[in-house]
């Protein structure tokens, strides 16, 4: 069954799970953007019924688009929602077959992950139903390889069309009105949330997180504009453009992933944001809390944006200029777009098409950077990609974003730690561009695994959702290894759901009594060495080491009992 969104006054009774009559095409776009405040995957196809000819009397430029243009717009901006777009003359039998096949594939969370990655066929009517780009079902449930190919091979003309559509959307859709709670009090509270190292990501809705991103990127752009007002080739996004950009980035993440979702992206961005403030690359702001161990408590002061402070933090010499700082923050925001909720090891072991394409090297990170650059930024902010990172260099923001995202591959972790040690002791002499790339890479790496450096309650929340995602991967492995007997592993007719992450440490420990095992392993193997070395190079980040040590001692003590 499917959700039906009809703009032609017609429903499809034999397919209808939920029916919404939509008054106009702009209203349809608003509805689809708002859907991603829900923190689940789309587990049913959405059938959109559009009139083949646009209404002659409408004043909306979006409404006046042709059927083919509307189809292109919808499939570009909302393909994560599993859309089947039809006009009045749809073929009943073909539509019913497509919806039935899509419904079967989408029903279960583990099945969805297998289908996205291209590692399973056990629930598919034909082996190539998802992986053949000419297949109708491939467009309804876009796999990773489908998304990669469509966006990497898109023509210049199509890109220009999509930029035009984006401009129309920004002109006609007020993204601030799409936020679930845009009251001044709530927006002010979010300013203070951004200012805390104990960033309460799991107590914030997806819409709250969108506004948090808006706050941080706006602050960085304002600083860039102040430092470099003469760059006329760089397009400064309006407030509505920037918020729309964040909505679009959010829609590129898989909301149902327990860990690698939009919330994680915002958390990594917020960690990078704190790093660059403490390192002097951005000035501190009024809502910034210098004590990293203070627990967040909701408060507001009426300010709905971050207010720059006149006071600078002590002994700060900027390590990145304003353009490089913005590049790092944007890379953090997009560093996991399209993440399927698996690991590189999984993708390689089970011959995922993307692993074959990227020769088993940084598979997911290569995918994230390609999709973020070619699908999102090339349409939403092309002038940012072309911007030089410095007046004396050929290194562009695009180059920095790619190198930063690739650095988040944990398979390359030891190599970066060794480079850090060499750089720290002056054994490795780098030119200016490579120094900027290394500093950016190290900061995003630290931010990516900063969960263990957050105060214990927040850190344990992240540990809990990560354990959920690892458990899903193990279930998927079992399904692949026993495809002939999938029903004995999991009921594919039922979806997998989770309770909301508790905000109380003791409740988390009750639900996950062995949480300390993974935390001790990760801190010992990866985090402690990286953060101790980065703090020697950048002593302003010493606080991360102090919190890691406190958390580690807690987990070690718990492991004794």
Where are these regions (language model features)?
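Divalent metal-dependent phosphate-bond-processing catalytic cores, especially two-metal-ion Mg2+/Mn2+ enzymes
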Residues: 143-208, 215, 219-223, 278-281, ...
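All-alpha helical catalytic cores of prenyl diphosphate-utilizing isoprenoid enzymes
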Residues: 235-238, 258-267, 297-301, 337, ...
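Eukaryotic serine/proline-rich intrinsically disordered regulatory segments
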Residues: 289-311, 488, 492
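Short hydrophobic beta-strand segments
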Residues: 1-7
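Non-catalytic interface/linker regions that flank or bridge core catalytic/transmembrane domains
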Residues: 13-17, 22-285, 289-290, 295-298, ...
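Structural signal for hydrophobic/aromatic residues that build the beta-strand cores
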Residues: 6, 19, 28, 32, ...
């Amino acid at each position: 069954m499917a959700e039906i969104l009809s703009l032609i006054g017609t429903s499809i009774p034999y397919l209808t799970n939920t029916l919404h009559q939509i008054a106009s095409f702009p209203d349809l776009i608003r509805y689809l953007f708002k859907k991603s405040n829900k923190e689940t995957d789309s587990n049913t196809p959405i059938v959109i019924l559009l009139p083949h000819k646009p209404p002659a009397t409408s004043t909306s430029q979006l409404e006046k688009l042709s059927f083919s243009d509307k189809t292109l717009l919808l499939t570009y901006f909302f393909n994560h929602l599993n859309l089947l777009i039809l006009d009045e003359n749809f073929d009943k039998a073909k539509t019913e077959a497509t919806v039935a096949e899509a419904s079967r594939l989408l029903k279960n969370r583990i099945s969805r992950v297998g289908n996205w990655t291209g590692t399973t066929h056990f629930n598919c009517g034909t082996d190539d139903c998802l992986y053949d780009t000419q297949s109708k079902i491939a467009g309804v449930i876009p796999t990773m390889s489908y998304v990669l190919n469509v966006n990497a091979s898109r023509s210049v003309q199509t890109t220009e069309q999509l930029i035009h559509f984006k401009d129309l959307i920004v002109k006609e859709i007020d993204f601030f009105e799409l936020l679930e709670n845009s009251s001044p009090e709530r927006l002010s509270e979010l300013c203070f949330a951004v200012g805390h190292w104990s960033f309460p990501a799991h107590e914030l809705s997806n819409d709250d997180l969108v506004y948090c991103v808006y706050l941080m990127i706006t602050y960085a752009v304002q600083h860039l504009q102040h430092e470099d007002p003469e760059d006329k080739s760089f397009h400064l996004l309006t407030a509505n453009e920037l918020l729309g950009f964040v909505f679009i980035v959010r829609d590129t993440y898989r909301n149902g992933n327990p860990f690698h979702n939009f919330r994680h992206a915002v958390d990594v961005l917020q960690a990078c944001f704190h790093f660059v403030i403490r390192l002097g690359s951005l000035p501190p702001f009024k809502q910034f809390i210098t004590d990293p161990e203070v627990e967040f408590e909701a408060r507001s002061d009426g300010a709905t944006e971050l207010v720059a402070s006149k006071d600078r933090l002590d002994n700060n010499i900027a390590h990145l200029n304003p353009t490089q700082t913005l590049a790092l923050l944007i890379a953090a925001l997009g560093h996991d777009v399209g993440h399927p909720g698996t690991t590189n090891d999984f993708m390689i072991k089970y011959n995922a098409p993307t692993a074959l394409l990227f020769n088993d090297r940084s598979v997911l990170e290569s995918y994230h950077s390609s999709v973020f650059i070619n699908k999102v930024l090339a349409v939403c902010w092309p002038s940012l990609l072309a911007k030089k990172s410095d007046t004396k260099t050929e290194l562009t923001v695009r180059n920095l974003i790619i190198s930063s995202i690739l650095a988040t591959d944990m398979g390359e972790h030891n190599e970066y730690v060794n480079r850090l040690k060499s750089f720290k002791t002056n054994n490795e002499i780098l030119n200016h561009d490579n120094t900027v790339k290394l500093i950016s890479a190290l900061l995003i790496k630290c931010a990516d695994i900063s969960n263990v450096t957050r105060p214990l309650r927040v850190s344990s929340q992240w540990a809990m959702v990560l354990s959920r995602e690892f458990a899903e991967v193990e279930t998927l492995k079992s399904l692949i290894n026993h495809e002939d007997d999938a029903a004995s592993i999991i009921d594919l007719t039922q979806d997998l759901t989770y309770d909301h992450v508790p905000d109380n440490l003791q409740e988390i420990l009750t639900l996950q009594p062995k949480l300390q095992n993974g935390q001790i392993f990760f801190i010992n193997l990866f985090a402690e060495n990286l953060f101790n070395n980065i703090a020697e190079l950048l002593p302003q980040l010493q606080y991360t080491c102090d919190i890691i040590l406190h958390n580690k001692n807690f987990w070690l003590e718990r492991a004794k009992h």
